[in-house]
């Protein structure tokens, strides 16, 4: 039997993203040379929301892009097992990342493997001056030495729990962060 527990509702997500936006601005001493890159899929929408908040706070339009890490994963999945073709969605970074302070944005930080793949993919696009990581939820259980610079909420979990982020933009459901517990 699976039990769902909502740990962040729409209002909590909005507050967390506002706080993270302020933290990004403060840590980078403004928005000069700053860029946001969302990791597909939900990281893209969270990066857009951070972009909107930073624009409201600073009045500066920080560049936003998105990155597809499919070919960089160590657990590559295929859209068709017969042809062994990976399901690639494409990267869209319409600005030069060389010398920029890039904030990678994702929904959940777990093992660190997604972030490692995103950094590899980003380095193939250019050479940023810095790479920071912003996540909505950090659930622990790292397998790689990766730590988020900006965290919406730390959510300690056990091995039989899964953290799921639902966003209106993608899931057509109310924004929420949910822990699914197998009992």
Swiss-Prot record:
EC id: 2.4.2.9
A GO BP entry: DNA-templated transcription termination
Alphabetical UniProt keywords: Glycosyltransferase, RNA-binding, Transcription, Transcription regulation, Transcription termination, Transferase
CDD domains hit by this protein: PRTases_typeI
Residues holding substrate: 41-42, 106-114, 139, 163
Keyword Cell division among record annotations: no
Membrane-crossing residue ranges in chain numbering: none
Reaction(s) this enzyme catalyzes, per UniProt: UMP + diphosphate = 5-phospho-alpha-D-ribose 1-diphosphate + uracil
Broad class of enzyme this protein falls into: transferase
GO molecular function: RNA binding; uracil phosphoribosyltransferase activity
Family that this chain belongs to: Belongs to the purine/pyrimidine phosphoribosyltransferase family. PyrR subfamily.
Primary role: Regulates transcriptional attenuation of the pyrimidine nucleotide (pyr) operon by binding in a uridine-dependent manner to specific sites on pyr mRNA. This disrupts an antiterminator hairpin in the RNA and favors formation of a downstream transcription terminator, leading to a reduced expression of downstream genes.
Name under which the protein is recorded: Bifunctional protein PyrR
Record organism: Listeria monocytogenes serotype 4b (strain F2365)
Taxonomic lineage: Bacteria, Bacillati, Bacillota, Bacilli, Bacillales
